[in-house]
């Protein structure tokens, strides 16, 4: 073949290899993937009638993907070890070339379809598919020619061997995952029989509801193994806590638990954070720096927000997970790693794979054992024990006596908690800082709940619900609705108070000392523009919202005439002032995400830089926990 011709052929082959590797990483369905690989071979390189056979446990080759053959027809075709040309490839582990099939006595023509070739000659090239040195299948293609065998079979064999290697890796990955799944299912079945409720908090995890008890049983089951665990659940449901619990119950508990928030770092930083860098790798790299993979050696690496890493970085991570080794940025030495991986995400990874945003092969790698954390609204039994746990924790951290009224607990029980356990924890902490006598009462929750409920408010607004209909659930009046005789109770109902901005409460000295930082001033903030609707406001309370104010409001004074003096803020309908809308949403998002700007940005569909700018613009003090 002339030089130019060979050059263009190898370029085409390279392109096809690129296509094939993309196809293999793009779908969760192995058969479908293999059919597409064969289609690409036929389309790009005129390699027709492609066939992929895989070896079963009985050492029989079965056809799993074929060009131009129905699934039913393909399912019938099999070769035993040594049978026909295909069986020989399995037996010898060597490629085979048949220049003219019509003259080959070994050819069994089991798949048929070559009868209408007339004057053309069909040749066959077949190569073994190997995984970790073992033959797991056979890939064959036909070359059809008008002029007899063309004699390019050497390059065909080389090229098909590369394709077969890629297929081998994919098959191995699918089989490993399937095996681990089967193992876990057997284990789950066995352990379910022994499942007993877990009464006391384990590793600080409070759990009394049946679904959290099941989660903890799962934690017990997976902890002893090295299997990768994927923890899924909404923001604030306790994914990191569960990851730590798995580590603490594992044989690796005395080695480090290292966490990386993948969403918080741009790709270049993430790479050097995870893999480390060598001195001089980039401007500012003044000395060698160990990455988190190295720091977690012998222990557990927790990759939080794994769904947020870029496609480019997904490929890098996949390589490390497959090969268990990596190089530091700017370094050439290969470093071996021994970490147990736990990943977490609140994204729908299957959807991301479907949209091509998350690699299917990485998905398989990390989705070995999955633990789903239910949102707090689906495990209301946990609200009381969690609230008491946070009260006790605050009291202990600050060296003070603190209790919570039963009525306050009732209020908490009726909220929807879109920010989950983190929102509940923040709410209790804010209320605790306002308690002057060591008792958390319904009233002291009000300011906290303004913020908590703002998230619900935003959800309803984005759904286009009637703002008036929300008011009883959200407004401070709702929280201020307390029994007669109490400050702010029905006796004062006709003149409800606007919740005054509470004075900054100095943080108790103990807390600051415990954190090793100077004391901060906790400034509870009522939500700007959050005002109560007038009595009889339009729109029914939403039945999905169990917040306290679903009960009817006490009678209200009629709305003032336009000529009258402006009413107190609490008397005005619950419309969001135009200028305050972004501020409200910001507060909501920051509260919901535990004041992590990157997460809040994602929730709002903004960039982190935009959120940071908006926080400054609205003069919102950033809380640090
Ligand atoms: N079952 C629980 N018992 C006690 N505390 C809990 C529980 N679940 C969550 N928490 C507390 O709630 C807060 C949020 O939990 P965590 O950070 O683990 O959530 P997450 O799901 O990882 O959130 P994100 O997705 O936003 O990273 C933490 O302070 C954690 O200690």
Swiss-Prot record:
Residues where ATP binds: 233-240, 296-305
Top-level lineage group: Bacteria
Compositionally skewed regions (Pro residues) per UniProt: 540-570
Keyword list, A-Z: Activator, ATP-binding, DNA-binding, Metal-binding, Nitrogen fixation, Nucleotide-binding, Transcription, Transcription regulation, Two-component regulatory system
Pfam family, one: GAF
DNA-binding region: 597-616
Residues in Sigma-54 factor interaction domain copies: 205-433
SMART domains with a match to the protein in the record: AAA, GAF
CDD domains per record: AAA (cd00009)
Residue segments, region Inter-domain linker: 434-582
Biased composition (Low complexity): 489-498
Sequence positions that bind a divalent metal cation: 447, 452
Region (Disordered): 478-578
Record domain GAF: where: 29-171
GO molecular function: ATP binding; ATP hydrolysis activity; DNA-binding transcription factor activity; metal ion binding; sequence-specific DNA binding
Role this protein plays: Required for activation of most nif operons, which are directly involved in nitrogen fixation.
PANTHER family reported in the protein's UniProt record: PTS-DEPENDENT DIHYDROXYACETONE KINASE OPERON REGULATORY PROTEIN-RELATED, TRANSCRIPTIONAL REGULATORY PROTEIN
Quaternary structure note: Interacts with sigma-54.
Designated name of the protein: Nif-specific regulatory protein
Organism, scientific name: Azospirillum brasilense
